[in-house]
């Protein structure tokens, strides 16, 4: 049973990561379900088991982000301060966005999250993203690096809001500046407000 779940998760993961690579390389409109199935080495049956169509993949960007966070978790060391961990995660994710996500698709995801009546994936607190933030911020408060005047939940919410605001502005400005560079300059000032 466990192997079946792992295989299913791997199949879905292959479809999602392949789709986003193709969206970036060929453009969303020029990528077909057949392209995704072929490049991912899966089947149409598997594709339609997980997704109702190509449009359903737009809501998987947060899944792709969480996949990156899981990968980056191994690079976090106990010697790193909580601030260093947050700066590292932010830099790496924003580089991923700049290098592999088309601005129009990111903008589409952000705008769809504003109008959807269904699940708002970016706000799902069961995501790896939120779990990782909670862990880092709790560690920062326990070590005395971060203030305890604000709750872990409040700091997590403010941090996530900060990142979404930067992504939104970057899309609004049509990527005229480096998202990762701008964040590297602004995030330390934002986080300074939470130092103990």
Model-derived segments and their meaning:
Residues 1-26, 30-42, 56:
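Basic, helix-initiating cap at the start of DNA-binding domains
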Residues 41-51:
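Short hydrophobic/aromatic patch on the recognition helix
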Residues 84, 121-126, 142-158, 177-181:
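All-alpha amphipathic helical-bundle segments outside canonical DNA-binding/catalytic cores
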Residues 94-134, 145:
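Short secondary-structure transition hinges
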């Amino acid at each position: 049973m466990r192997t079946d779940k792992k295989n299913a998760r791997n199949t879905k993961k292959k479809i999602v990561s392949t789709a986003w690579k193709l969206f970036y390389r060929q453009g969303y409109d020029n990528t077909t379900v057949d392209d995704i199935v072929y490049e991912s080495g899966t089947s149409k049956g598997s594709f339609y088991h997980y997704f109702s169509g190509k449009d359903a993949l737009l809501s998987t960007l947060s899944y792709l982000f969480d996949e990156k966070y899981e990968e980056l978790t191994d690079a976090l060391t106990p010697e790193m301060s909580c601030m260093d961990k947050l700066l590292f995660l932010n830099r790496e994710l924003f580089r991923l966005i700049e290098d592999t996500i088309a601005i129009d698709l990111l903008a589409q995801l952000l705008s769809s999250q504003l109008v959807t009546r269904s699940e708002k994936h970016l706000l799902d607190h069961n995501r790896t993203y939120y779990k990782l933030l909670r862990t880092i911020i709790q560690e920062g408060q326990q070590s005395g690096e971060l203030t305890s005047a604000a709750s872990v939940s409040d700091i997590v919410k403010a941090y996530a809001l900060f990142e979404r605001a930067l992504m939104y502005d970057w899309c609004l400005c049509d990527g005229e500046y480096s998202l990762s560079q701008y964040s590297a300059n602004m995030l330390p000032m934002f986080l300074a407000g939470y130092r103990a």
